[in-house]
Swiss-Prot record:
GO BP terms in the entry: adhesion receptor-mediated virion attachment to host cell; symbiont entry into host cell; viral tropism switching
InterPro entries registered for this protein in UniProt: Phage_T7_Gp17_C
Other remarks on this protein: The orientation of the G segment is defined as G+ and G-. G+ orientation provides S-U fibers whereas G- provides S'-U' fibers. S-U and S'-U' dont have the same host range (e.g. respectively E.coli and C.freundii).
Keywords noted in UniProt: Host cytoplasm, Host-virus interaction, Late protein, Viral attachment to host adhesion receptor, Viral attachment to host cell, Viral receptor tropism switching, Viral tail fiber protein, Viral tail protein, Virion, Virus entry into host cell
Induction section of the entry: Expressed in the late phase of the viral replicative cycle. Expression of late genes is activated by the viral late transcription activator C. Expressed alternatively with tail fiber protein S' (associated with tail fiber assembly protein U'). The switch from S-U to S'-U' is performed through inversion of a DNA segment called G by the phage invertase protein Gin.
Domain of life according to the entry: Viruses
GO annotation, cellular component aspect: host cell cytoplasm; virus tail, fiber
Pfam families, sorted: gp37_C
Transmembrane domains' residue ranges: none
Subcellular location: Virion; Host cytoplasm
Protein name listed in UniProt: Tail fiber protein S'
Organism: Escherichia phage Mu (Bacteriophage Mu)
Upper classification of the organism: Viruses, Duplodnaviria, Heunggongvirae, Uroviricota, Caudoviricetes
Family assignment from sequence similarity: Belongs to the caudovirales tail fiber protein family.
Role of this protein: Component of the tail fiber that acts as a receptor binding protein. Binds to the primary receptor, thereby determining the host range. Two alternate tail fiber S and S' proteins are encoded extending the host range of the virus.
Amino acid sequence: MPKSTIIQNLGLQETVNQASGALQQNQNGADIPGKDTFTKNIGACRAYSAWLNIGGDSQVWTTAQFISWLESQGAFNHPYWMCKGSWAYANNKVITDTGCGNICLAGAVVEVIGTRGAMTIRVTTPSTSSGGGITNAQFTYINHGDAYAPGWRRDYNTKNQQPAFALGQTGSTVGNDKAVGWNWNSGVYNANIGGASTLILHFNMNTGSCPAVQFRVNYRNGGIFYRSARDGYGFEADWSEIYTTTRKPSAGDVGAYTQAECNSRFITGIRLGGLSSVQTWNGPGWSDRSGYVVTGSVNGNRDELIDTTQARPIQYCINGTWYNAGSI
């Protein structure tokens, strides 16, 4: 009797049919025909590959192109999906539009959490890189829709420590020293002024009567200036210079006389001028003379009458020139 007849007689045909499509235990899942669909159906995370050429060459990528590639790999079919880029610079793209540094995907670990419409992507870069990629870094991209401020951020760590200002130079070089607005992000800006450039330190807390303050520093100790904002009106006053030991204020700056003005206005010396004398006894005597003082009375023969009277003018010096004093 044929085997098929025996199976039919025993009612085992359905069992045989199911067994022919069953997974084999000794295959340990290797015979699952649609692994991606299987992991999706059971809600499992997908470790896609430990050695994957991400993009296939070393050319630059935009974030949008990177997301399209992830979608083509089924990354959004699972609650969590990850892969690791192959360790070959020539076979992996470089993302250049993050705004916080280039991501070379060679050797990078890529993790995707969420759906195509509400995703979080995390990329961890290795300790060496190519294409200007940032090493030892963790980049995170969050996109819950275009209306919800999608974008990248890069975390600081022991290998990528945060500087005093997180981005070094903030933004691009501005056209002049008044171009940085009061409500701009705090940072250190480079500004063009008169064929050179100057450093603008900008601090903005966006609250209070003085919401922002700026310092302008010129090269080679060429001066420090500041200006402060008022409420929401911005910088109403121009730059004011901070005086230092090497940049002292002029007399005009503080409302004082210059040395030349002082020399032309102030008396620097007083003296008695040349001697004059006149016969007093049996002579004309001495009439009043403006600015003179009597300095001597001579009685040569020692009688009861003065023979001669002596006088000298009072003189004062202004700016090196002596003048006779007038009467009051």
